[in-house]
A protein has these predicted regions:
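Amide-donor transfer/coupling interface in amidating biosynthetic enzymes
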Residues: 1-11, 128-136, 141-227
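Short coil/turn connectors at secondary-structure junctions
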Residues: 15, 58-59, 91-93, 116-117, ...
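Hydrophobic anchor at the start of a short beta-strand
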Residues: 41-42, 95, 200
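Structural motif
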Residues: 63-65, 96, 202-204
């Protein structure tokens, strides 16, 4: 079991508010993870949940959860969230996408569903169903190159500056092409499964299902760095 670190707040500093897109997919686990780390976690179901009256973000960060990426895309457009999400993330709002959320953040989808769109935030190409079979689904320890990580003695973590993360792959996507401005944070069997570019972080896997805090800590570190 990894020991997580709650946010260290200076006197007078309030806990960050992190919105979790809650139209479809695995929302509750992300909410619980964020709350355990000291953040205020809220569900984002509408533009009013995302933006304040002045049109600026009502949250300090976002999580796009796992689920079915084409369904999430369709619902975002149905509820008028697609363009506002795209705008605030491109403007610098720290954002984490896991599994389907990674697909939504990508610029290119190798095998999109009919009519499927993505937010075009991460300069990567994703294969939606790279870990599509039950055989390919797995729970593993991965070397992790993020600032937040857990020290370990696992052989597979030897090359990881920050240690290892526990990851669950469930019919997960993979990253098949990475642009010049994208940092690779983790690989599984030589396949890229976690990336970061500017304010956006994406993972093929589900850290929240493993009780793994490092990825969400990374997101909160991005909020802290933004001021």
């Amino acid at each position: 079991m990894h020991i997580h670190k709650e946010l260290e707040l200076t006197p007078g500093q309030s806990a960050p508010t992190v919105g979790v897109l809650a139209l479809q997919g695995g929302v509750a686990e992300h909410l619980a993870m964020l709350e355990s780390l000291g953040a205020q976690a809220v569900r984002v179901r509408s533009v009013a949940d995302l933006l304040g009256d002045d049109g600026t973000p009502a949250v300090d960060a976002l999580v796009l959860p796992g689920g079915e990426s084409s369904t999430m895309d369709r619902l975002c457009r149905t509820f008028g969230l697609f363009e506002p999400l795209q705008r605030v993330i491109h403007a610098g709002l720290p954002t984490l996408g896991t599994c389907a959320g990674l697909i939504m953040l990508s610029t290119r989808i190798a095998d999109p569903a009919p009519g499927q769109q993505s937010l075009g935030v991460l300069d990567v190409t994703v294969d939606r169903n790279a870990f599509g079979s039950q055989v390919d689904s797995a729970e593993v320890s991965l070397p992790w190159s993020g600032a937040a990580g857990h020290a370990g003695t696992d052989d597979d973590a030897a090359a990881a500056p920050s240690g290892v993360v526990r990851a669950a792959f469930i019919r997960a996507p993979s990253v098949t092409e990475v642009g010049d401005g994208v940092e690779v944070l983790a690989r599984y069997r030589d396949t890229v499964v976690a990336v970061r570019q500017a304010n956006a972080l994406g993972t093929s896997f589900h850290p929240e299902l493993m009780g793994e805090t490092a990825v969400h800590e990374e997101l909160l570190n991005m909020v802290r760095a933004r001021g």
